[in-house]
Amino acid sequence: ASTKGPSVFPLAPCSRSTSESTAALGCLVKDYFPEPVTVSWNSGALTSGVHTFPAVLQSSGLYSLSSVVTVPSSNFGTQTYTCNVDHKPSNTKVDKTVERKCCVECPPCPAPPVAGPSVFLFPPKPKDTLMISRTPEVTCVVVDVSHEDPEVQFNWYVDGVEVHNAKTKPREEQFNSTFRVVSVLTVVHQDWLNGKEYKCKVSNKGLPAPIEKTISKTKGQPREPQVYTLPPSREEMTKNQVSLTCLVKGFYPSDISVEWESNGQPENNYKTTPPMLDSDGSFFLYSKLTVDKSRWQQGNVFSCSVMHEALHNHYTQKSLSLSPELQLEESCAEAQDGELDGLWTTITIFITLFLLSVCYSATITFFKVKWIFSSVVDLKQTIVPDYRNMIRQGA
């Protein structure tokens, strides 16, 4: 880094309190290069209570340091305290007087203003539009309605024609001290399925202009869903609870209802994924029912019920139970596992016995060889002639 003179900032305590007997005044010397820099107070006349900290090299490659002087609180405000900085490498001299500046307390911040009411429009539930016995409803929800302007006016239109059969529910106060207002319009099943357009117009004094929201059934050619049920996996049968799966694929639009039942009674312990877009533009989903393994093994029948506008009578059902084929397969699998376990046990025992027999044979052979070798050595020592006596006799 090239030579650079420092920037100097005087630091004063920010308090009106006079309870403290002393006050700490500071001087920040920043962004200079190279070292050193000299800091004094009142041109060197003030030395008592002065503490200058070592310089610190910053990531920028420049240095900074600070100096603090402690003075009596009674003197601060009546006497002048000046920080004198001298940086000889850059020929920079700076004098800064520390002035008493008391902080003014800020008033409490007001609560952030609400931007104004927001409007949301929700379609009827798929099951409600597909069953004559149920009542489909389009719901218009207005949130963030202020106490100052609580009155909300709803106007409903079906294909551009205003209707007057909607019902507005009482206002509900929310945690943020605003109101939530809901208006519900009952619709005709076939009107919704035929793609009629529903519009909710909301007027409120907190709005610069009325807000309009429009909704209708998704446009496009309906496609019939294909439904497949899947039994629990073999690996899961070792647990106390098992999963039955229902795959629904190839349907359009995404409005669909999936439920489970057993012996005519609804099953509630199931989870269904949201419809997901497939590569061909249709939708698919999975639904998983969790049941006790004992119920499955007892042969109970579980049914996956699907409702969609493209189905005949808007309804289909696929059942699932432990069939003899599945039971036989599970039994065979268990038997096969048992046979494999028995086979591994047999192989382990055989290998163990084989190794023991090899060790035993090797030990016996070792001792036999040792005994034979010892016998041969003893025999040789017995039959060796005494050639020395024979030579003496010949002489």
Curated annotation (Swiss-Prot):
Domain Ig-like: 6-99, 117-216, 225-321
Subunit organization: Immunoglobulins are composed of two identical heavy chains and two identical light chains; disulfide-linked.
Stretches for region CH3: 220-326
Cystine pairings recorded for this chain: C27-C83, C140-C200, C246-C304
Protein name per its UniProtKB record: Immunoglobulin heavy constant gamma 2
Lineage start: Eukaryota, Metazoa, Chordata, Craniata, Vertebrata
Site (At or near the complement-binding site): W156
Listed result of changing S257A: In IMGT allele IGHG2*01
Region Hinge, residue ranges: 99-110
Cellular component GO terms, alphabetical: blood microparticle; extracellular exosome; extracellular region; extracellular space; IgG immunoglobulin complex; immunoglobulin complex, circulating; plasma membrane
